[in-house]
């Protein structure tokens, strides 16, 4: 990639690369075509909510969320899976993480008054990717523009389209 990281996998709407904390920061700042940057905590297979609970509970959440961390399942999506209720998936995943952190931190209750750790769950054909969202708002809303107008496409899509052309930074680009 342009940032110097090796791409591990390319799937529909998702590019996976390995990196450290600095790589996450750099990706959030410099990637022009990404909507968000996430840290994959795990991939789990589940066709029942009990299987989902146990699989999520088995992940190493203590490596990502500190004892005072504020965490919630910001979004759950499901396509062609037996588990089809996003709200139920959100509830089960949150409960499983709480149970895991109770065991790891020897706590019965969490204040959740520290840094925020939004979680996203993507189910496809009974396999879920569980990830921490490091971007917050979509990256096309990075906030460097004070006054914006409605555009027919997002900045990230526009950047991708330009990258497919022979244009380079030494040439003038006009956005009519």
Regions found by a protein language model. Give the residues of each.
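Non-catalytic nucleic-acid substrate-recognition regions in nucleic-acid-modifying enzymes
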Residues: 2-117
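Conserved class I S-adenosyl-L-methionine
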Residues: 169-176
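SAM-dependent Rossmann-like transferase core, predominantly class I methyltransferases
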Residues: 130-166
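Short acidic-glycine loop/turn motifs at beta-strand connectors
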Residues: 124-126
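Hydrophobic, well-ordered secondary-structure segments
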Residues: 90, 94, 98, 118, ...
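Short, glycine/acidic-rich beta->alpha junctions
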Residues: 113, 153, 176
């Amino acid at each position: 990639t342009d940032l110097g990281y090796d791409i591990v996998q390319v799937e529909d709407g998702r590019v996976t690369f390995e990196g450290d904390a600095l790589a996450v920061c750099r990706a959030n700042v410099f990637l022009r075509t990404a909507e968000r940057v996430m840290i994959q905590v795990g991939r789990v297979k589940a066709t029942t909510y009990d299987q989902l609970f146990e699989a999520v509970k088995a992940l190493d959440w203590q490596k990502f969320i500190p004892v005072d961390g504020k965490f919630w399942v910001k979004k759950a999506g499901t396509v062609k899976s037996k588990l089809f209720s996003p709200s139920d998936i959100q509830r089960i995943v949150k409960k499983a993480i709480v149970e895991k952190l109770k065991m790891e931190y020897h706590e019965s209750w969490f204040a959740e008054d520290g840094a925020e750790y939004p979680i996203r769950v993507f189910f496809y054909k009974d396999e879920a990717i569980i990830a921490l969202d490091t971007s917050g708002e979509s990256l096309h809303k990075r906030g460097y523009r004070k006054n914006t107008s409605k555009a027919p496409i997002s900045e990230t899509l526009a950047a991708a389209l330009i990258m497919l052309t022979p244009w380079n930074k030494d040439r003038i680009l006009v956005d009519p």
